[in-house]
Amino acid sequence: MNVYEGSLVATGLKVGLVVARFNSLVTEQLLVGAADALRRHGVKDGDIDVFRCPGTFELPALLRRVARSARYDAVVALGAVIRGGTPHFEYVAGEATKGVAQIALESDCAVSMGILTCDTLEQALERAGVKAGNKGAEAAVAAVEQANVLREAAKVPSPRRAE
C-alpha cells in the first residue's frame, strides 16, 4: 500500500489570499491569521499576495482568476457572511461555497476556503481569532497541506498497461 500525504512545510510555496472587504472587521482578522500561519510554516512575505474583492459573493470570480494565473501553488478564499433577516444569507453563502468548490475541482493549484457563515457578528469574530482559533489560519494551513499532496500525487507513475 502506498500512502501520499501533504506536509505542512510551506517553504518555497507561493500563495494567493483572496479577501472580501464586506464585513472587514472579521475578514481582516482572517487575513492576519492566514498570513501569520503561512509565515510560521515557511512562506516568505514576498511569496504571499493579497487580492481584495467587494464581498463574499464576488470571491469565486477573483479566486478563479488568481488560481488560473499559474503563479500560485495555493489560493485561499477569506470572507464572512452573517445571517440577517432575509434569505440573502443563504444565497450568498451557498453560491460562494459552490463557486469555491468548482474552482477547487478545475484548478491545478490547491484551493482552500476560509469563508465564515455565522448567525451573529460575535460568532464571526470568535472564529476570526478574537477568542480562540482563527479559521483564516486553519484555511491557510489546509492550503499548504493540499498544495504539497497535489505535488506528491503528480509524481505518482501511471499504471502500466498490459500489451
From Swiss-Prot:
GO cellular component, one term: riboflavin synthase complex
Broadest EC class assigned to this enzyme: transferase
GO biological process, one term: riboflavin biosynthetic process
Binding site for (2S)-2-hydroxy-3-oxobutyl phosphate: G85, T86, R127
Signal peptide stretch: none
Substrates-to-products reaction catalysed: (2S)-2-hydroxy-3-oxobutyl phosphate + 5-amino-6-(D-ribitylamino)uracil = 6,7-dimethyl-8-(1-D-ribityl)lumazine + phosphate + 2 H2O + H(+)
One term of GO molecular function: 6,7-dimethyl-8-ribityllumazine synthase activity
Listed EC numbers: 2.5.1.78
Pfam families: DMRL_synthase
Cross-referenced InterPro entries: LS, LS/RS, LS/RS_sf
Binding residues annotated for 5-amino-6-(D-ribitylamino)uracil, in chain numbering: F22, T56, F57, E58, A80, V81, I82, M113
Domain of life according to the entry: Bacteria
Catalytic center residues: H88
Pathway in which the depicted protein is active: Cofactor biosynthesis; riboflavin biosynthesis; riboflavin from 2-hydroxy-3-oxobutyl phosphate and 5-amino-6-(D-ribitylamino)uracil: step 1/2
Keyword set, alphabetical order: Riboflavin biosynthesis, Transferase
Coiled-coil annotated residue ranges, if any: none
Role noted for this protein: Catalyzes the formation of 6,7-dimethyl-8-ribityllumazine by condensation of 5-amino-6-(D-ribitylamino)uracil with 3,4-dihydroxy-2-butanone 4-phosphate. This is the penultimate step in the biosynthesis of riboflavin.
PANTHER family named among the record's database cross-references: 6,7-DIMETHYL-8-RIBITYLLUMAZINE SYNTHASE, 6,7-DIMETHYL-8-RIBITYLLUMAZINE SYNTHASE DMRL SYNTHASE LUMAZINE SYNTHASE
Family from the record: Belongs to the DMRL synthase family.
Protein name: 6,7-dimethyl-8-ribityllumazine synthase
High-level lineage: Bacteria, Pseudomonadati, Myxococcota, Myxococcia, Myxococcales
The gene coding this protein: ribH
